[in-house]
Amino acid sequence: MSKRLALAYSKKDPAGSGMAREIKDMMGEEFEISDKRCELIEVDREILYINGSQFEGFDYLAVLSRHSGTPNHPIFTAHVSGNFGRARYGGDHFKLSIAIPSLMKEYLISVSKRAEEIGYWVGFEPTHHGPTLDIPTAFLEIGCDETAWRDERGLRAAAESVLEAIESWKDGKFVAAVAFGGPHINDHFTRVELFTRFAIGHAARKLDAEWVDGEMVKQAVSRNGEPTGVAIVDNKGLKGEDRERIEGALRDLGLEVIRVKKILRDELGEEEGEEI
C-alpha cells in the first residue's frame, strides 16, 4: 500500500518556493514515485512555527526549505526539527519531531552528485528549531544566503535530488542511528551520511549537550523514525561530563555506542576523518 508524502514549503521562503516550483515543473503538484504518493503543499506561515494540522492524513513530511547561517558558503543540508533544549525558533521546549533518517541520507547522497559542479558544499545538520511534529519529518535545504536561495542551478539541483531521494528511499536499507557531539555542521557526521551504511536521524550538537539527559536520549531514540540500536559519538566534540552522561544513558537503553572516527576508519580507511 502506498504512503502519502507531503512536500511542504512556505510562501515566505524563496528557497522552499523555488524548490517547489522546480518540482512542479518536472512532476506537477501531485505525483507518485515508487510507493509514495507525493503532494506539494504551500503554507502561509514560516514552517518553523506551524502546528502540523495541515498534514493530517499524510504519513511523512518533507520540508523544502532555506538554510541560514553557517558556513557562509553555498551548501545543501538536511536535518530533522526539534529542540533538545529551550525552543528559541519555534516548536516546543525539550521536544523532538519524529525523524526520517533514510530520506535525509538519500537527499545528501543525491545532492552530493551535483554539488561540486555548481560550487556547493553538502552538510548534515543536528536537530534544531521548530516545528515539533508527530509526523515523520525531514528538512531538505539549500543555503545559506539570499543569493543561494534564488540560484536557479542550485534550486534545480535540490529539486532533482529530492525526487531522486524519494525514489531511492526504502525502509531497512541503512542502519539507523542517533548521533551526539561536535559543531553545528559536523564534517564527520556528514561523511557518515555520504559514505557509510549508517543513516543518522536525531543528532545533538555540543552546544545542546548540556540539555541531553536520560529522558532526552530516550526521546531521541524513540522518535528516530526507524528501529535504532546504534549511537554515534563525536568523542572530542563533547565535554567529558556531557559525554559520560549521554553514553551512560545510551547504554542503559541497550544501544551500541560507536565513536565516529572508528566508523570512518573501519568503513572508509580514514585515521582522522577528512574534511569535505
Swiss-Prot record:
Keywords: Hydrolase, Metal-binding, Zinc. It comes from the Archaea. GO terms for biological process: D-amino acid catabolic process. One of its GO terms (molecular function) is D-aminoacyl-tRNA deacylase activity. InterPro entries: Deacylase_DtdA_archaea, DtdA. Its EC number is 3.1.1.96. It catalyses: a D-aminoacyl-tRNA + H2O = a tRNA + a D-alpha-amino acid + H(+); glycyl-tRNA(Ala) + H2O = tRNA(Ala) + glycine + H(+). Pfam families: tRNA_deacylase (PF04414). The keyword Lipid metabolism does not apply. It is an enzyme of class 3 (hydrolase). Its cofactor is Zn(2+). PANTHER family: D-AMINOACYL-TRNA DEACYLASE. D-aminoacyl-tRNA deacylase with broad substrate specificity. By recycling D-aminoacyl-tRNA to D-amino acids and free tRNA molecules, this enzyme counteracts the toxicity associated with the formation of D-aminoacyl-tRNA entities in vivo. Belongs to the DtdA deacylase family. Monomer. This is D-aminoacyl-tRNA deacylase. It comes from Korarchaeum cryptofilum (strain OPF8).
